[in-house]
Amino acid sequence: MARAFPLERVRNIGIAAHIDAGKTTCTERILFYSGVVHKMGEVHDGAAVTDWMAQERERGITITAAAISTTWDDHRINIIDTPGHVDFTIEVERSMRVLDGVIAVFCAVGGVQPQSETVWRQADRYSVPRMVFVNKMDRTGADFLKVHGQIKDRLKANAVPIQLPIGAENDLKGIIDLVENKAYIYKDDLGKDIEQTEVPSDMVDLVSDWRLKLMESIAETEEELLEAFLENGELTIEQLKSGIREGVLKHGLVPMLCGSAFKNKGVQLLLDAVVNYLPAPVDVPPIQGLLPNGKEAVRPSDDGAPFSALAFKVMADPYGKLTFVRMYSGVLEKGSYVLNSTKDAKERISRLIILKADDREEVDELRAGDLGAVLGLKNTTTGDTLCASEEAIVLETLYIPEPVISVAVEPKTKSDMEKLGKALTSLSEEDPTFRVSTDQETNQTVIAGMGELHLEILVDRMLREFKVEANIGAPQVSYRETIRASSSGEGKFARQTGGKGQYGHVVIEVEPGEPGTGFEFVNKIVGGSVPKEYIKPAESGMRETCESGVIAGYPLIDVKVTLVDGSYHDVDSSEMAFKIAGSMAFKDGIKKCNPVLLEPMMKVEVEVPEDFLGSIIGDLSSRRGQVEGQSIEDGQSKVQSKVPLAEMFGYATQLRSMTQGRGIFSMEFSTYEEVPRNVAEAIISKNQGNS
């Protein structure tokens, strides 16, 4: 079957931003103007096409990244609308991993917010080219050039306006295209009757200044363009367009556009810019991966190359499990068998689907550059590689952050107990930041996630989708343990109870590991003092002990263990004996390494009227917060701080009462830091009292 669109005319893009910047409304307008939907859905009415979960429609926020295909100007555009709430950061993360370009949406009033910085960093991590759409230009306080300054200062991006608004707030009449040097005046509320005209006389000087700045920025990206600019004093429209595109692809510049998605202004011009400036799959570097022999290899974006794809999302569906895939190379056909190279498992492709939010179109094949979904995969989870069996490769996977908060879940009845297991399995398959474990002491089921809202949504889904009635405990902070010193440890397990005994003996060295390494094991046994077959069990005993720590029962992180010596018995030694000896040696060593407790620190930004600044800073300090910066603009104060998560429960209610409902805040995970001794002692004694 021939391609519907050549690869050069495919765009895989994401729409990402801070919560409430207007991403979903922006996506809705794109679908309306490109003909996918014939009636505009509004987020505040709970009718947005991309918000298809019940919770999304109720809360007016996007939780899961909905993938939609549409067309514009003879191009296929695959769009992922990502959530802006920090608790759903994995949805943004996995979207960035499979996209070729991003539209970063900013509110013309709020500008750069903390979550904007997080999304920007995620796009940086995967080197995703991007453009900026400054939305909500119709709102009171909208200021396009202020947002331009914030993007340059706070995000350190070379933001270059390629448009200017004509008017602002209630007086937003249209948009200036700096590339074409034309004005677009909107004549109706639907944004379909647009008059193209000359630049208004009162804006000629301003437009001339910004057009010159645009030319200078583009001339700096390429020597040929610089010569043309110096020779002629300006660049042609074609040179401007090719220069912007080249600058975007090389991450040299970020074009800035503006409009109001809600008021239907600027969306068609945004679609034109997506087609003109964001990359096709063939414009980005080919995906890298590892061959079975450990050598690096690449897969070009080409139908003729061996098939490879990345599973970037798994979702429960009334018809079975839906696995979203980004096709990187080759062709995937319905009914074929492929290899899951991450798990070394064969998979059958039952059905292939292209999605339009909760609408779907069955297809016979997916090709390089496509975003689609597969029905019927048994073993594939988020981050797995699918490839041709005879041309195996494992692609770079996803970065998955650790959960920071947990709650105990107790089913109300026996039938709820049976349904709970199924619900938790299904939800954890969908969301890798959602973890399920059993508390060894209480035998309770514990679920962990990225924040209170994250767990609230998941518990809500258990009730709605899986009909599980459960009691939910109070939120608990996910503390960690680590060590600050080095030492050695020894474990000898010897039992003689008639007949065959048990014997295992290991000696280890323990030291702090590099941040982010978790548990690192090195085998330095020489001369066979511990036979090869007992090394893995000894390591396993240490890893298991790591899971429950040594001072307060929390997982131990960033520890390096080196196995240096030991002994065995020809008859009595066994894998179990060495597993126990490994655990004993680990506990012995860790206790001598100055173990400490770590807690998740949150980056908290609070925005309040100036009058409340003093009480806000005082309150943050009382919560063990460290104020890292503050600013005052138009009577509004912004305070940036780092606060322990343990001190932030119930903060929304407290902030409302302190500011008479006029304060807002955002919070995201920053890092793990050592808990002060007096606080740590209370946590440790509480945990030891419970054990």
UniProtKB/Swiss-Prot annotation:
Keywords: Cytoplasm, Elongation factor, GTP-binding, Nucleotide-binding, Protein biosynthesis. GO terms for biological process: ribosome disassembly. PROSITE patterns: G_TR_1 (PS00301), G_TR_2 (PS51722). It is found in: Cytoplasm. It holds the Pfam family EFG_III. One of its GO terms (cellular component) is cytoplasm. GTP binds at residues 17-24, 81-85, 135-138. Its main location: cytoplasm. One of its GO terms (molecular function) is GTPase activity. The keyword DNA-binding does not apply. InterPro entries: EFG_II (IPR041095), EFG_III (IPR009022), EFG_III/V (IPR035647), EFG_IV (IPR047872), EFG_V (IPR035649), EFG_V-like (IPR000640), EFTu-like_2 (IPR004161), G_TR_CS (IPR031157). Residues 8-282 form the tr-type G domain. Catalyzes the GTP-dependent ribosomal translocation step during translation elongation. During this step, the ribosome changes from the pre-translocational (PRE) to the post-translocational (POST) state as the newly formed A-site-bound peptidyl-tRNA and P-site-bound deacylated tRNA move to the P and E sites, respectively. Catalyzes the coordinated movement of the two tRNA molecules, the mRNA and conformational changes in the ribosome. Belongs to the TRAFAC class translation factor GTPase superfamily. Classic translation factor GTPase family. EF-G/EF-2 subfamily. This is Elongation factor G. It comes from Prochlorococcus marinus (strain NATL1A). The gene is fusA.
